[in-house]
């Protein structure tokens, strides 16, 4: 059998609480009840009313009716005792509910024949809890002896003075001395109560300890199999990446920073002439966006200032490019249009070197062909459309066309 070395989990504690196995410091609850009763007794137990009832009965000359006499005493007892009993019951119920975390032990109400098992009874008889209770009983005997000694030293004059007290004050003095004796006993027993609660808490968690196999099995039951959940996460990530890939393929160009930020820009003049952000990724996802764009022939422009500005001014994906960044985006689109016209072999536009705000062509030719058919430009593509591979406007094209390149930052 595996050794139980693991602490009980939250689910284990909840299941045990439903079975009635909760941490119970019964002596602390008893201390609260006794202290509440001792403090409330002088205020709730009205001896004057009891004495007045005796005087009333004695003053009647005729023989009282036994039934009416018993009913009157019952009413008086309820008026005096009912508030006292209810207060003590509430003082005992509230700490018990707090200890059980307001969990109702429904399963403990059922009739369980295993509680009559003599083997389990012998185990309980020679358990650590039984040894703890035996030691606690001996400590309480010592506490009671100490309480009597201290009480005798403090209040012996008041006790012997009862012989000379007036009869009307005897009841009140007895109540006061009794309350003092009870409170003194509780004060002397407080260290034993705290020690008992600590040992009880230790034994409670010791009984509910679990082995590693139980912890793993409970995790599988509550959270699901780890391998299945990992596969689900991978599938979910693949679904998300497919959406991002589609956005990359439909973008006019990707502006990078150069490895930490990737911003996709899409323009559809038929709908609205303002460009908007189609992709907005950082770090590892930004690198993946750049690789996928290069594989699909989507121009990748490396412009640190523009990428950072768009990332800062456009905090959400599918939002329009801010007014401060439109000029830089339009410069890139114009430059890409010039590159596309040169690649198609048409009449080249007025060639010029890109300004500092425009990207420069980086060395290295992108893979030939278009890996994403949806992004291939037809022969009648408008001049403002983005090129599948961006090149430098100064690069001549062999056989009437310019090689496709990706842009790089010059600033």
Swiss-Prot record:
GO cellular component, one term: plasma membrane
UniProt xrefs under Pfam families: Bac_export_2 (PF01312)
Superkingdom, taxonomy of origin: Bacteria
Gene Ontology process terms (BP): protein secretion
Compartments, record wording: Cell membrane
UniProt-annotated stretches for the region Disordered: 341-411
InterPro entries, per database record: BsaZ-like, T3SS_substrate_exporter, T3SS_substrate_exporter_C
Transmembrane segments: 28-48, 80-100, 137-157, 175-195
Key words of the record: Cell membrane, Membrane, Transmembrane, Transmembrane helix, Virulence
Keyword Glycoprotein: no
Low complexity biased stretches: 370-404
Its membrane topology: Multi-pass membrane protein
Coarse class of the protein's main subcellular location: membrane
Role description: Part of the bsa type III secretion system, is involved in the intracellular replication of invading bacteria inside the host cell. Probably necessary for the lysis of the vacuole membrane and escape into the host cell cytoplasm.
Family, as annotated: Belongs to the type III secretion exporter family.
Protein name per UniProt: Secretion apparatus protein BsaZ
